[in-house]
Design a protein with these regions (language model features):
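A structural signal for short hydrophobic beta-strand segments in well-ordered beta-sheet cores
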Residues: 78-81
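Active-site pocket-lining segment
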Residues: 228-250
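Glycine-rich beta->alpha junctions and the first turn(s) of the following alpha-helix
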Residues: 18, 132-235
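Short Gly/Pro-enriched turn/cap motifs at secondary-structure boundaries
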Residues: 26, 53, 68-71, 95-98, ...
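Internal helix-loop-helix
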Residues: 1-59, 96-104, 248
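A short core secondary-structure module
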Residues: 86, 90-133
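Charged, glycine-rich active-site and insertion segments that engage polyanionic ligands
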Residues: 253-258
Length: 258
């Protein structure tokens, strides 16, 4: 809510990830939801949701992928049927970040026009709520501070006023989601740079503490070559990330750069 630019956000995420990457992932998903509402929401939706997303009383989840539809958005099967002033949602979503603790889910569904629409699903934090259930908690090899779940919808009703963008937003969910995911990808890159920085610093400390042949291994040229290559790749990744952030701040499309 401070109005900071994307470049500043990128630096913050990088530093957070240097200490604990899961925290940055939680913030990223929340930020994607806020960005979608700020860019494409109606004035009423902005006034209703954004203040609570800024003060922390609402945590957002982003829900696009499905068991048989990861990056293939054209294969979405989760459907919403219009019933008067409500939409009735049925289907299953996969890899939902913040799913359990969220109060708002940015839900991509297929509507009767066979296009994708984004619904703003309000719920109570927890594993079940009025036709919404967490059907599976997904275990991961790492990144375990970030909850990732499968969520099922059975006849869950969403008010028509919660269609992102209002009546004009019907059928435009894919465009809204991909626009916000540009920012999300910059965040992922920032996280990677932060973790790489932490790894490089750990390697430097170890190279100064570990001794062989009576000297720190840092003084062996073979190790110096390895550390120099690490530093070069780290700085290259950082500059590529910053370039994408600066272009986004300038209003450019950055799907390739991100």
């Amino acid at each position: 809510g401070l109005g900071l630019d994307i470049m500043t956000y990128t630096r913050i995420i990088e530093e957070l990830s240097r200490g604990f990457m899961s925290l940055a992932g939680i913030l990223n998903t929340h930020k994607i939801g806020a960005t979608m509402i700020a860019r494409f929401g109606t004035e009423e939706q902005k006034q209703r949701f954004l203040p609570r997303m800024c003060d922390g009383s609402f945590r957002a989840a982003f829900s696009l992928s499905e068991p048989d539809a990861g990056s293939d958005t054209g294969a979405l099967r989760c459907r919403a049927e219009r019933d008067g002033d409500e939409w009735v949602v049925n289907g299953t979503k996969m890899w939902v970040t913040n799913g359990v603790r969220s109060s708002l889910v940015m839900l991509m569904v297929r509507t009767p026009d066979d296009r994708i629409t984004c619904l703003l699903v309000e719920k109570e934090p927890g594993e079940s709520f009025e036709g919404i259930s967490v059907s599976k908690k997904i275990d991961k090899l790492g990144y375990r501070g970030l909850e990732t779940v499968e969520m099922s919808y059975v006849d869950h009703r969403v008010p028509h006023g919660n269609v992102l963008g209002g009546e004009e937003g019907i059928g435009h969910g894919r465009r809204y989601a991909l626009s916000a995911l540009e920012l999300g990808r910059i965040n992922v890159a920032s996280r990677s740079v932060g973790v790489a920085q932490a790894a490089f610093e750990a390697a430097m400390r170890y190279a100064q503490q570990r001794h062989t042949f009576g000297r720190p291994i840092f003084e062996h040229q073979a190790i110096q070559f390895k550390l120099a290559e690490m530093a070069t790749k780290l700085q290259a990744a950082r500059l590529m990330t910053y370039d994408a952030a600066r272009r986004a701040d300038a209003g450019e499309r950055v799907d390739m750069e991100a």
